[in-house]
Amino acid sequence: MAFDGADSWAHPELFQFDEECLPKAVAGCPPDAFSATGQLWGNPLYDWGYHKKDHYSWWIKRMEYSLKLYDVVRVDHFRGFEAYYSIPYGDPTAEFGHWEKGPGLDLFARLKKSLKKEELPIIAEDLGFLTPEVHEMLKESGFPGMKVLEFAFDDSENSDYLPHKYQENCIVYTGTHDNETLVGWYENMNRRNKSFAREYMGCRHTPKKEMHWEFIRLAMASPAKLAVIPVQDYLGLGAEARINEPSTLGKNWKWRLLPGEITGDVLKQCRRMAKLYGRLPETVSDINM
């Protein structure tokens, strides 16, 4: 929730604010592979003690309305429900924060009960710094986590993001809004990782301009229950089509899909792969294209 958002203004009791409605601390994440100084998001932190006392009524209303709009809700920063990173308000970077305990699965148990659902249609965004406690919370929740294919080829050749290590109860993405497009990412890979990726996929002789389709194929062929492919990757677009670069300002969230960019040939290839790997809905599987 943004500091200047409607809920922050209307319901300051939901957040860790002082008497003047200024944040006592703000959200972010510690230094990692994305940023040497961490990510300073600046969002106010929830007052979980208040939310629990109020039986999570704000969360129930929020989820209830979201499920009127969407079939599935991706819960961002799922690890924050186990423990969240608290950064002193006014700090210029996220380097000097600390971890505090979140509500755990108590929130989701209350959501299930209040919304009268045996299973909540939730995808848990479980990326970033994960502890054994976070892994255990995800397992106990039953929610599918996320696998990002671009994380699989990272010099180790033993990454947990390699598709042969996936369980069915996960969602595979070629990349998210925080990643480079497949084309931009492959362009910046070192020779060793490119060689390993080609060997892993059995495509040593695939032309460079077709490599994005090999990674899409890898995601489609994985055991993951759902494969999510950004449209930029289907179109084979480069760094100019990246959505967001963490810890930067000015150029993010500006890319737009223009009319006519998705051609008939691209649609045919999308359908062919989806059908080949059993990911085409039955209602359209026999439609000629």
Language-model region placement:
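In a subset of proteins, long, contiguous C-terminal domains/tails are tracked
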Residues: 236-289
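Alpha-amylase-like alpha-glycosidases and glucanotransferases acting on alpha-linked glucans and related
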Residues: 2-228, 232-234, 239, 245-260
